[in-house]
């Protein structure tokens, strides 16, 4: 049995917010980028990998997480996910089984801005 065949709505226990970058002009006329919430959805959240490495005289960390949610056509790789106080960069978006029923998003914790 494929993993997406066994998926059911009861597995979607975590609230995840989908963020979109917007650009406004501040009072001095300079562009200001900010992330605004587009939607909040229920999702299954599964940590899948993590590692630490030494770069630029500091310890860096990578934490990858799999988010599975109901299919949405409006999610793009230039968006972010917010879950449990952390923002995640979208690394991959997969339509599980190609049936537009479940969406799997691979995300990586953003450690700087």
What kind of region is each of these model predictions?
Residues 1-4, 9-10, 25, 30-113:
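Short, conserved turn/kink motifs that form compact alpha/beta structural patches or helix kinks used as
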Residues 20-21:
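Short acidic, Pro/Gly- and aromatic-enriched capping/linker segments at domain boundaries
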């Amino acid at each position: 049995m494929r993993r997406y065949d066994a998926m059911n709505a009861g597995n979607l226990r975590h609230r995840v917010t989908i963020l979109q970058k917007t650009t406004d002009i501040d009072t001095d006329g300079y562009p200001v980028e900010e992330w605004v919430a587009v939607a909040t959805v229920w999702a299954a959240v599964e940590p899948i990998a993590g590692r630490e490495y030494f770069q630029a005289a500091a310890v860096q960390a990578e934490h990858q997480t799999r988010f599975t949610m109901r299919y949405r056509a409006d999610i793009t790789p230039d968006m972010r996910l917010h879950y449990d106080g952390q923002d995640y960069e979208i690394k991959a978006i997969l339509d599980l089984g190609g049936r537009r029923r479940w969406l799997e998003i691979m995300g990586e914790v953003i450690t700087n801005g």
